[in-house]
Amino acid sequence: MNQRVLDISAYQGEVDFQRVKRDGIWGVMLKATEGERYLSPAFEKNYQQAKQANLEVGAYHYLRASTVSEAVAEANFFLSKLKEKQLTLPLAVDIEAPEQRQIEDLAPIAAAFCDTLEKAGYYATIYSTVDWFKTKLSARELDRFDRWIAEEGVSKPNFEKPYGMWQFTWNAQVDGINGRADESVSYRDYPNLIRQAGLNHLTPELPARAISVEELRSMGYQAVKL
């Protein structure tokens, strides 16, 4: 499946999610938090309005951590702002902060963040550029996590490892948004994957497409009770 997904933050200002939905957008990834203290002032409103528009909704955190302990603290802060949220798309950690350029291997930091999300029962994915995935986030220990890759100006990403979403433009024009937005394509049926695995504190809905253990394993989950 190929579905259109936007990532939305306070930068977009007022968003008419009903018009966004009518323009063919399937889901939105909403910026929730950054660092250990920043909560996006637009997150709650964007969440409520996106749900009312019947969009699939996920959330992301902009990582500032430079150590494993800081990553865990940021993940817990992120989680604290997601209580009672019905999220049918992944929780993403956005790794691209300028201060992280000097860190050669970000894998332990990324893994610590995602492990914290998974221990809390959520579906985790890592967002970054293809360049960073090839260099700073290339360690095998991250292969058990899903990826949301970013590369603009190409017909196909220059990346060989599996990924679930590809952000292909930072200049999408979508009805309901003043100005530009980042647009991705989702290749996976995240709502079904997440519900069937009992993640994001969601319960399976019937009827639902049956999901195989092999498909779940391909997403990085080695032991899942169906």
Where are these regions (language model features)?
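Short Gly/Pro-enriched loop/turn and capping motifs at secondary-structure junctions
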Residues: 98-100, 131-134, 152-156, 170-173, ...
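Short beta-strand/turn micro-motifs composed of small residues
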Residues: 61, 128, 151
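Substrate-binding cleft of extracellular glycoside hydrolase catalytic domains
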Residues: 1-22, 26, 30-123
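Functionally critical loop-and-helix segments that line ligand-binding/catalytic clefts
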Residues: 1-11, 140-208
